[in-house]
Regions:
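Bacterial N-terminal signal peptides
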Residues: 5-13
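Sec/Tat signal peptide C-region and signal peptidase I cleavage site
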Residues: 14-19
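Active-site regions of metal-assisted phosphoester/phosphodiester hydrolases
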Residues: 20-59, 98-268
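Proline-aspartate-enriched helix->loop->beta-strand connector
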Residues: 57-61, 65-70
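Short beta-strand and adjacent tight-turn residues that come in two discontinuous sequence segments
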Residues: 71, 92, 249
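Acidic helix-start/capping segments at beta-turn-to-alpha-helix junctions
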Residues: 74-80, 198-203
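Glycosyltransferases and closely related glycan-assembly transferases
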Residues: 81-87
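A short, structured active-site edge motif that brings together acidic residues
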Residues: 90-97
């Protein structure tokens, strides 16, 4: 699972707004895990939070001073618990919460994707694409499994296996469903931001440089073989190919000094 807990950046294509306008709002992506309910199976039981996590989730959003938040694993569409906890000044368009007026343009429930237009000050509109890709055949878990079975496995072969698993028949995560509205917005020269839980790492993190110089990605690795090798993860490659820019990597260009770690805390 590659769940974003407090990960403030997504992928962005900027065609209409300049840097000055973009600096006027803060965008956040946040997987709140199982609708903010009792997520004990992933280490977030309600008993740790006084019976409910909703107030802590709202507090985290406020602490981040976010203006727009793409939520994954949101509360039920019929429930406004989080919206109510955020308080006055917030509205909701599907799973996108905003201090600015927001309108749901498109949703695909099968692939947990929503397209939302947000109107900033001065009638400037940005498009937010919020996605949650399927977790099946999660590459790092597969790599851990292979390393446990054979710590001396050829890492180049292992990289090929985990890369191909994401795109094999029945194993895609939601790439095309996400790419389509992005390409449409880019063609229309809109300012667009992609946020989400991608359930897949980025090729900008799993580089040759990181494979040589980075730390072991596997906390308490029992195999003796560091989990670090070059992988051209297909999802992030596809996004880069259509012109999207990883905003985290744009500002933090050294993936060894600033690795893009987005693991949920209980996981290695």
């Amino acid at each position: 699972m590659n769940s974003f807990l407090l990960f403030f950046v997504g992928l962005v294509s900027i065609s209409q707004l300049g840097a000055e306008e973009l600096s006027r709002f803060k965008l956040m992506t946040f997987n709140i895990l199982q609708g903010g309910g009792n997520a004990k199976n992933v280490g977030f039981g309600n008993e740790l939070f006084g019976g409910s996590r909703i107030d802590e989730i709202a507090s985290a959003i406020k602490l981040a001073r976010a203006d727009i938040v793409g939520i994954q694993e949101d509360c039920s569409s019929k429930s406004n618990m989080l919206l109510n906890e955020l308080g006055d000044g917030w509205n909701r368009a599907g799973k996108v919460y905003s201090k600015f007026p927001a309108q749901l343009i498109h949703s695909n429930k099968d692939r947990s994707l929503e397209v939302v237009d947000v109107e900033l000050a001065g009638s400037r509109v940005v498009r937010i694409v919020n996605c949650h890709w399927w977790p099946n055949n999660y590459g790092p878990f597969l790599a851990q499994e292979k390393l446990r079975a054979d710590p001396q496995v050829d890492l180049n072969s292992l990289a090929k296996i985990v890369q191909e698993k994401g795109v094999r028949r029945g194993g895609t995560r939601g790439y095309s469903t996400t790419i389509e509205p992005l390409e449409e917005a880019i063609d229309e020269k809109r300012a667009i931001f992609l946020v989400g839980d991608f359930n897949e790492p980025s090729h900008l993190d799993w580089t040759e440089n990181y494979a040589r110089n980075g730390s072991d990605r596997w906390v308490n690795n029992p195999t003796g073989t560091p989990l670090r090798f070059l992988v051209r993860w297909p999802g992030s490659v596809l996004l880069e190919n259509i012109g999207m820019v990883d905003s985290f990597r744009q500002f933090h260009t050294d993936e060894v000094k600033k690795p893009g770690n987005t693991w949920t805390p209980p996981y290695p």
